[in-house]
Amino acid sequence: MERIKELRDLMSQSRTREILTKTTVDHMAIIKKYTSGRQEKNPALRMKWMMAMKYPITADKRIIEMVPERNEQGQTLWSKTNDAGSDRVMVSPLAVTWWNRNGPTTSAVHYPKVYKTYFEKVERLKHGTFGPVHFRNQVKIRRRVDINPGHADLSAKEAQDVIMEVVFPNEVGARILTSESQLTITKEKKEELQDCKIAPLMVAYMLERELVRKTRFLPVSGGTSSVYIEVLHLTQGTCWEQMYTPGGEVRNDDVDQSLIIAARNIVRRATVSADPLASLLEMCHSTQIGGIRMVDILRQNPTEEQAVNICKAAMGLRISSSFSFGGFTFKRTSGSSFTKEEEVLTGNLQTLKIRVHEGYEEFTMVGRRATAILRKATRRLIQLIVSGRDEQSIAEAIIVAMVFSQEDCMIKAVRGDLNFVNRANQRLNPMHQLLRHFQKDAKVLFQNWGIEPIDNVMGMIGVLPDMTPSTEVSLRGVRVSKMGVDEYSSTERVVVSIDRFLRVRDQRGNVLLSPEEVSETQGTEKLTITYSSSMMWEINGPESVLVNTYQWIIRNWETVKIQWSQDPTMLYNKMEFEPFQSLVPKAARGQYSGFVRTLFQQMRDVLGTFDTVQIIKLLPFAAAPPEQSRMQFSSLTVNVRGSGMRILVRGNSPVFNYNKATKRLTILGKDAGALTEDPNEGTAGVESAVLRGFLILGKEDKRYGPALSINELSNLAKGEKANVLIGQGDVVLVMKRKRDSSILTDSQTATKRIRMAIN
């Protein structure tokens, strides 16, 4: 303080001012400090001082030819004196203005393409809507967010290869463009940037913005998709928030959102199939999101959602080491435990076998609407500090923490029996049983938990069993805080294993994820999700199952008809017929199947009594386990459009209608495709299929013994000849082919040759 006063006094004297402004600086240390090295020591001062000079800029000599010495106002634009120590010209800032107004223009066509992300951002802001500003306490928690809207999802290495290929195609160095997205982007960008005059380095920087996801760990209280993050500084402060609706969507946010929906649908569907893991993989590999293979997106996209992580684990990818319980992400921050099985009794005297975690541990819990810090010991909650958007969200977090603590008073609070099942009708494990029970009704849990008086701690208040705040007492060990708990910031990924029931474990055997953790929330995807797997046919309801089943048979008719005649059991077990069974009334499934299989067997024995259309029509019914009964049916019922509709065994119906003239099949009025061969040729279709792999040599030749039935053909050795009985009792001579390569053409030529041989 004294010093400052002294300085003020000194400054008020004119002599002091004179010394400071007029004296030259000649102290070596000072000169050294400001002149050594290339780094500017005081950029702001340097800039001010330079701009005060007449010619602060130096330019190449060529400038003299390109810029006049004076502008229209007669002001000098450059000096005739050379820049000291170089052969450059000294130039006035006015020359820059002149150049901008009168200098040569280049084509602007590439700017929107190179600076695409900026142009798009301007559009989003132009069309965005800013609402009112609200002043209130902001509970922000740090989350890893995407700060770069409109990017593809390439890894840094993949992007580097694309950028080198686009911007510096002649540079030496091996570049391997393997993924589909890399190739597409490279091709597209090369075309867009033909004859581009913008500095290559700039183009490279901008391409990087477009190709790579950039994430930062930022405090956020609202939306976390990249179109909200780009305006974070406009929408939330320490004590205020401004409502904002983005003026456009970007593909990367849409991909994230659609990926989560696809993954949830796939996990839910896989859970109910016979082999969940195999089904999940089959679905991931056959699904496309916005035209890109789901497995490619999973490899590149860092989204950390439960269903997405289960799919990643199944593909053998690393995932985050945090685990999920009750929709919250738990991350252990200190302590350790080992598990041991214990039997406990509920308030209803039901015995539960639970894996008890013994030892002291601390966790952060992060959910969509609430976060918490949990400290626990063996079967005991020591402290829980929660923060959340509203009472409901806070209650959700408290229930999850209380169940997770495995405390006895929680187990004793169970009223009634625990018998929750998952989608596949299997009982849930005990921890999830407890969770579901209290999520339905936590009243008894909160009442029995116990309350304690609390100290007055800044930023923390108590919460009563009915979830109202209090400054005097609180649920034992539980406090509500104004401050949120940050998400786990590390992006570290660990190797995990997955069992066939989709339970994901870390290398120590702790369960990180299971299908029970997958949210039941339904949403509408932003990008088109195409599930090619038959397991997902039912996602659009019974009609889609019906149409898809018949379309599948028609598309694969060539192979289906061979199996139909040679290996029907294998055909009936195909998973493509699984969804169809849900349409057939339960009581009738076995009877229908028995009836159709018998019918098919008669067709095989007495060739010539069937037509292709009828096989296609009845085939899905044969897939159910058959009941042996003598029942005959003239029509079969399927449950679509909320009621039973009939498929006629012989003839057309609104459900299944084949038009002989156009050879097209209509299912429930929707076109289901064309049959490529002519079903009117009676048996030719199946015979040519059966005779694939055989060459038809001509009419019967008695030297080769009695005529075999078509089913006996499979015993022939390659190159062996035999007579075979086909169609309406005709016999032809065939030879089993020596090679398999020509099999494909057989079915076409067989039909013609059979005709020739018979005639």
From Swiss-Prot:
Cited Pfam families: Flu_PB2_1st, Flu_PB2_2nd, Flu_PB2_3rd, Flu_PB2_4th, Flu_PB2_5th, Flu_PB2_6th, Flu_PB2_7th
Transcription regulation recorded as keyword: no
GO annotation, biological process: 7-methylguanosine mRNA capping; cap snatching; DNA-templated transcription; symbiont-mediated suppression of host gene expression; symbiont-mediated suppression of host mRNA transcription via inhibition of RNA polymerase II activity; viral RNA genome replication
Primary location group: virion
Key words of the record: Cap snatching, Eukaryotic host gene expression shutoff by virus, Eukaryotic host transcription shutoff by virus, Host gene expression shutoff by virus, Host nucleus, Host-virus interaction, Inhibition of host RNA polymerase II by virus, mRNA capping, mRNA processing, Viral transcription, Virion
Family, similarity comment: Belongs to the influenza viruses PB2 family.
Full protein name: Polymerase basic protein 2
